């Protein structure tokens, strides 16, 4: 058994986060979960919108247009390792907090800019949200049922998949490079860039059952009978993802599916008919019975669990995917580290106290 350190792998990292929405706070949450000390610059009077995503911050209410506020922020950033901001391009420059100014004062600063469209390009100054950003990458066009409008996939794909995850990776890469050069740099983390990168698998596939330009028609897009969701007798739902022949065979055997489904699994001409037959089969039993038959096997099966019930699923409980902290259920820090695990910490100090300590070398 590895001996656990007191804090996560980013212990000692000093981060200044400017209040924002969506992916920016998620970046700071991930860094804080893994041990970074995060001072959050907030507008005076701000009330936390999401206590889970905004956890483990040392808050400072700052008027960025006042002399006092400017002095405080510049002092904080003189000692910080990382800055995270999500304003439109040019806002930080107009506040006197652009990269040229701050990197001159602190050449080791990693300056992370989290936006939808990026720092340049014809759409850089346009308003937008997750749905708009993924719309121009080709991702949204492929999500939904055949002959119907695209379905917004929450804001997982853009804000958090192509946004905060890539921004965090960029920050860590810049910190790693800083160990060699001694210099910080700007990380331009645009959601459109991240989502395009997420789509590399699809852009790289030839036109086939895996990649099609028709919505709802690909193997992974919901057309295949062995990779989709089905309704059960009680109205609850299940997911099946039995792509490989051996897993498909196990699904059919354990579910006691019609014999004819065993032939022609990968022939798209069969998919509509086979989908109807599996849909009828899954309607014969409630979800709990299908769970007893299929969960934990090689049938590639899982029940569709509502958001508010996810923490109670046996596997999620066994993994400790949710933790209780401060009287609230929180998502656990991820990923897991065997020697320096992340943890959810209290925000015991206010931001001004933390910056004062940084200024004194602490």
Show the residue positions of the predicted features.
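Flexible, small-/acidic-enriched active-site or ligand-binding loops
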Residues: 2-6, 325-362
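A structured beta-alpha segment of the ubiquitous adenosine-cofactor-binding alpha/beta core
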Residues: 4, 16, 53-105
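Conserved small-residue-rich beta-alpha loop and adjacent elements
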Residues: 7-46
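Active-site-adjacent "lid/gating" segments in soluble enzymes
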Residues: 30-34, 95-238, 242-243, 342
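Conserved dinucleotide-binding and phosphotransfer motif residues
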Residues: 34, 79, 297
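Active-site loop/turn elements of alpha/beta-hydrolase fold enzymes
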Residues: 36, 43, 64, 89, ...
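Aromatic-enriched alpha-helical interface/lid elements that frame and gate functional surfaces
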Residues: 226-297, 301
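A glycine-rich dinucleotide-binding beta-alpha-beta segment and adjacent secondary-structure elements
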Residues: 295-344
């Amino acid at each position: 058994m590895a001996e656990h350190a007191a804090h996560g792998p980013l212990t000692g990292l000093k981060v200044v986060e400017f209040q924002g929405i969506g992916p920016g706070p998620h970046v700071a949450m991930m860094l804080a979960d893994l041990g970074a000390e995060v001072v959050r610059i907030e507008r005076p009077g701000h009330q936390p919108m999401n206590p889970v995503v905004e956890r483990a911050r040392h808050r400072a209410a700052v008027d960025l247009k006042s002399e006092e506020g400017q002095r405080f922020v510049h002092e904080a950033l003189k000692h910080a390792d990382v800055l995270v901001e999500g304003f439109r391009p040019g806002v930080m420059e107009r506040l006197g907090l652009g990269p040229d100014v701050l990197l001159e004062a602190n050449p080791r600063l990693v300056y992370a800019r989290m936006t939808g469209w990026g720092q340049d390009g014809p759409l850089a100054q346009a308003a937008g949200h997750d749905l708009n950003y993924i719309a121009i990458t080709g991702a949204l066009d492929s999500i939904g049922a055949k002959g119907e409008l695209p379905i917004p996939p929450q804001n997982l794909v853009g804000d958090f998949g192509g946004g905060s995850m890539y921004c965090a990776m960029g920050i860590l890469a810049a910190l790693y490079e800083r160990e060699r050069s001694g210099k910080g740099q700007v990380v331009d983390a645009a959601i459109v860039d991240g989502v395009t990168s997420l789509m590399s698998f699809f852009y790289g596939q030839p036109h086939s059952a895996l990649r099609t330009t028709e919505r709802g028609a690909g193997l992974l897009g919901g057309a295949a009978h062995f990779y989709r969701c089905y309704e059960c007798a009680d109205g609850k739902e299940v997911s099946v993802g039995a792509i490989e022949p051996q897993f498909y065979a196990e699904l059919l055997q354990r579910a006691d599916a019609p014999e004819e489904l065993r032939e022609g699994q990968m022939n798209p001409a069969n998919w509509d008919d086979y989908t109807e037959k599996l849909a009828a089969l899954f309607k014969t039993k409630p979800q709990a019975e299908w769970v007893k038959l299929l969960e934990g096997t090689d049938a590639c099966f899982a029940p569709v669990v509502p958001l508010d019930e996810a923490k109670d699923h046996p596997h999620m409980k066994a993994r400790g995917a949710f933790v209780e902290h401060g009287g609230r259920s929180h998502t656990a820090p991820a990923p897991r580290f065997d020697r320096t695990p992340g943890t959810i910490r209290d925000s015991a100090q206010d931001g001004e106290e933390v910056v004062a300590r940084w200024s004194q070398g602490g």
